[in-house]
């Protein structure tokens, strides 16, 4: 595509009943090995979902350290989406789950950044950590940096406040 820093999102939560690709570690390794062989030395970001199991996260970090330059954590979290009356809010037959983003997932993003920082330090890994999830106000940026993020990204927060990055820079 010509991207200067491609990101491979292995964490999309709307895969039906299947697990996220990033939870299937052997599959993840094959995919990222292939990507690395195609892009050569171009910096590469691996986007992941939330890991409850720390042993699995360590194994993922080993894969990332070998094939990626950065881990972007996290993507949206799957959740049941209902309207104010408790009815299915998403269009489509039996489509009750969707990706939840914004402030409700910040705890998970901060947790992943802290754990990835600890893993990186313990195993002397070299990948960068991009903190994502629930960055709505400037203080959220500070929380991610203090947790160990090398960079902080915002999607939902930037949609609601297009000046968020400028406010963070001026702080």
Language-model-detected regions and their locations in the chain:
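Glycine-rich beta-strand-to-loop/alpha-helix junction loops that act as flexible
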Residues: 1, 47-49, 129-135, 154-156
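Conserved beta-alpha-beta core of the PfkB/ribokinase-like small-molecule kinase fold
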Residues: 1-59
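Glycine/Thr-rich beta-alpha phosphate-binding loop at enzyme active sites
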Residues: 4-26, 60-125, 167
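Catalytic cores of alpha/beta
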Residues: 52-66, 118-122, 135-152
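Glycine-rich phosphate-binding active-site loops on the catalytic face of alpha/beta enzymes
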Residues: 70-80, 134-135, 141-168
């Amino acid at each position: 595509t010509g991207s200067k820093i491609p990101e491979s999102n292995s964490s999309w939560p709307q895969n039906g009943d299947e697990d996220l690709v990033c939870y299937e570690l052997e599959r993840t390794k094959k995919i990222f090995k292939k990507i690395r062989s195609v892009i050569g030395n171009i910096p590469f970001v691996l986007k992941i979902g939330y890991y409850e199991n720390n042993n699995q996260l360590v194994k993922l970090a080993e894969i990332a350290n070998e094939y990626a330059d950065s881990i972007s954590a996290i993507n949206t979290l799957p959740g049941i989406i209902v309207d104010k009356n408790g009815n299915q809010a998403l269009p489509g037959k039996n489509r009750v789950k969707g990706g939840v983003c914004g402030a409700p997932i910040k705890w998970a993003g901060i947790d992943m950044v802290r754990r990835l920082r600890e893993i990186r330090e313990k195993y002397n890994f070299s990948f960068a950590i991009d903190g994502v999830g629930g960055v709505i106000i400037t203080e959220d940026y500070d929380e991610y940096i203090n947790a160990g993020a090398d960079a902080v990204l915002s999607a939902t927060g930037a949609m609601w406040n297009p000046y968020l990055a400028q406010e963070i820079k001026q702080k």
